[in-house]
Structure formats: structure tokens, C-alpha cells
């Protein structure tokens, strides 16, 4: 199986690092290309031990899956660049936020099978949660192959394309939202008088330990919280303070804003 990546940004890098680390494919079956920065592309390809090229005809002639990972606003130029060399065996996997399948097909001027995936940067460590939607002409075997590829860097949620907006908000942008929460936790802990490096290390291990508890327990997160919250204790006092600031409403606003922006991008052909 030959994979070609158009675009080598942060998300694309996380994906092909995840695939390489999974050893599902040999590195010489993965090809990278970008818009113009050949030196950076060469260095990165050599670092990973994968191939790189700017010869679109060569890249596409026997490519099984073509990952579209350019910036959404660059896609029209990418489509014009590769359209003459697309063949019927190419299947496309888009990681471009906000661009619907029908728009991608229009720009490529083809009816080849197209999947849209919305991973997150945890793909780099094999723990992305990836939403995926398929065009109607994606066959069962091809779906299985794509799911197998995506499972190489985490877990998969297959949804209707309209629901990718919600997946984008919850899991696609999720790592950034959680990093921001942890960042504020570090600042608040440092304000209590502890050294910043002590607080950062403590919270890092707190996050790891709590994640393992969630992973290994059959209990809901709500029940896990209740199990360590004693009436009148310190944990209850802190939770009461969070409730006064309506943390539930804060997260709803956060996710709704991300969904709204994803919908906006999908309606804007000038992305």
C-alpha cells in the first residue's frame, strides 16, 4: 500500500508519525510533499526515513490513499496542481477542517472515493480520537483499510458528515482546550506559593494517574468524582467554587463556539 501526504503540517506529521510507529506500513511506502519548502521537507523526510517528491505524476500514479493535509485556504491551488494526474485508483483522505466532501470533489473534478477524518495531535503517541465520514462510493474493503490506518494512531468514531462539526469541537480541538485548563491549573497552583517546576511535574503526574483511573475503571467519571468527594471536605469546597463560576456553561460555550466556527468554514468556499 502506498500513501501520499500533501501537506506536512502539525496534524499531518502526527498522523504519519503514528502510522510509522505502528509499523503497519514500511516507511518507503509513505511519500511526503508540501507547497514549496523543499529543504524543510527533505530534512523531515530523512528524519522519518520516508520518501519525498514534488513530481505529482509520480506520486499519484500508483498511490492507494492520498492524504489531503494542506491549509483549507490553500486547497484550491493544491487541487489545480494534482488534478491532471489523478487516476481511478486514487482514494482521498482529507484532514482539512471545514471542507465538505462535495466541495473537495468539485475542486478535484473527480468522483473518486473521499473520506474526511478529524484526528487530533495525540495521533503522534497513538492515542488520537478520530472522527471519520465516507463518501457514498467508498467500498467496504476500502473502508476497512482506512479504519485500519486510522486505528494505527488511535481510536475511530464513524459519523455522518454533518456530525463532524461536533467531533471537531469535542476531540479535534480537545487537546488544546485541555492544555489550556491544565495551564491555568499550573498558574493557580504556583500562586499558592509552590515552585512552578514542582507544580508542573505534580500536575503532569496527576493527569497521567487520573487518565489511567478513567481507563481502567468501569465507573463513570461522575461516579469516580463522587467517590473522592467527602461532604464538607476540601474537595467539596473546591468543587463548590467551580460551581459558582458555572464551569458547565463555560465548556458549553467553548464547544459551541468551535462547532459554530467549523460550520462557518464549511460554508465558506474561500477558506
From Swiss-Prot:
Gene Ontology biological process: L-proline biosynthetic process
Source species, domain of life: Bacteria
Keyword Isomerase recorded: no
Main location: cytoplasm
Keywords: Amino-acid biosynthesis, Cytoplasm, NADP, Oxidoreductase, Proline biosynthesis
Pathway named in the protein's UniProt entry: Amino-acid biosynthesis; L-proline biosynthesis; L-proline from L-glutamate 5-semialdehyde: step 1/1
Annotated Gene3D superfamilies: NAD(P)-binding Rossmann-like Domain, ProC C-terminal domain-like
GO (cellular component) term, any one: cytoplasm
EC numbers: 1.5.1.2
Compartments where found: Cytoplasm
SUPFAM superfamilies: 6-phosphogluconate dehydrogenase C-terminal domain-like, NAD(P)-binding Rossmann-fold domains
Reaction(s) the record says it catalyses: L-proline + NADP(+) = (S)-1-pyrroline-5-carboxylate + NADPH + 2 H(+); L-proline + NAD(+) = (S)-1-pyrroline-5-carboxylate + NADH + 2 H(+)
Enzyme class: oxidoreductase
Entry's Gene Ontology molecular function annotations: pyrroline-5-carboxylate reductase activity
HAMAP family referenced in this protein's UniProt entry, alphabetically: P5C_reductase
Function, in words: Catalyzes the reduction of 1-pyrroline-5-carboxylate (PCA) to L-proline.
NCBIfam families: proC (TIGR00112)
Record-stated family: Belongs to the pyrroline-5-carboxylate reductase family.
Protein name: Pyrroline-5-carboxylate reductase
Species of origin: Staphylococcus haemolyticus (strain JCSC1435)
Amino acid at each position: 500500500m502506498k500513501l501520499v501526504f500533501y501537506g506536512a503540517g502539525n496534524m499531518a506529521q502526527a498522523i504519519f508519525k503514528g502510522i510509522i510507529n505502528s509499523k503497519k506500513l514500511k516507511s518507503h511506502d509513505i511519500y511526503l510533499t508540501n507547497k514549496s519548502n523543499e529543504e524543510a521537507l527533505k530534512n523531515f523526510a530523512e528524519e522519518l526515513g520516508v520518501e519525498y517528491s514534488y513530481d505529482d505524476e509520480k506520486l499519484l500514479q500508483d498511490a492507494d490513499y492520498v492524504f489531503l493535509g494542506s491549509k483549507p485556504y490553500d486547497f484550491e491551488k493544491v487541487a489545480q496542481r494534482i488534478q491532471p494526474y489523478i487516476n481511478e485508483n486514487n482514494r482521498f483522505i482529507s484532514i482539512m477542517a471545514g471542507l465538505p466532501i462535495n466541495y473537495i470533489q468539485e475542486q478535484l473534478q473527480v468522483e473518486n472515493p473521499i473520506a474526511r477524518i478529524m484526528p487530533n495531535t495525540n495521533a503522534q503517541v497513538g492515542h488520537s480520537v478520530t472522527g471519520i465520514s465516507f463518501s457514498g462510493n467508498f467500498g467496504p474493503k476500502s473502508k476497512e483499510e482506512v479504519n485500519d490506518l486510522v486505528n494505527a494512531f488511535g481510536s475511530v468514531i464513524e459519523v455522518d458528515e454533518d456530525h463532524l462539526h461536533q467531533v471537531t469541537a469535542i476531540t479535534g480541538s480537545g487537546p488544546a482546550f485541555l492544555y489550556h485548563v491544565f495551564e491555568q491549573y499550573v498558574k493557580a497552583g504556583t500562586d499558592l506559593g509552590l515552585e512552578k517546576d514542582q507544580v508542573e511535574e505534580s500536575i503532569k503526574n496527576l493527569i497521567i494517574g487520573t487518565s489511567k483511573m478513567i481507563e481502567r475503571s468501569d465507573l463513570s467519571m461522575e461516579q469516580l468524582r463522587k467517590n473522592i468527594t467527602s461532604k464538607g471536605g476540601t474537595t467539596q469546597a473546591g468543587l463548590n467554587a467551580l460551581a459558582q463560576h458555572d464551569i458547565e456553561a463555560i465548556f458549553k460555550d467553548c464547544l459551541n463556539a468551535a462547532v459554530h466556527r467549523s460550520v462557518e468554514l464549511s460554508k465558506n468556499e474561500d477558506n
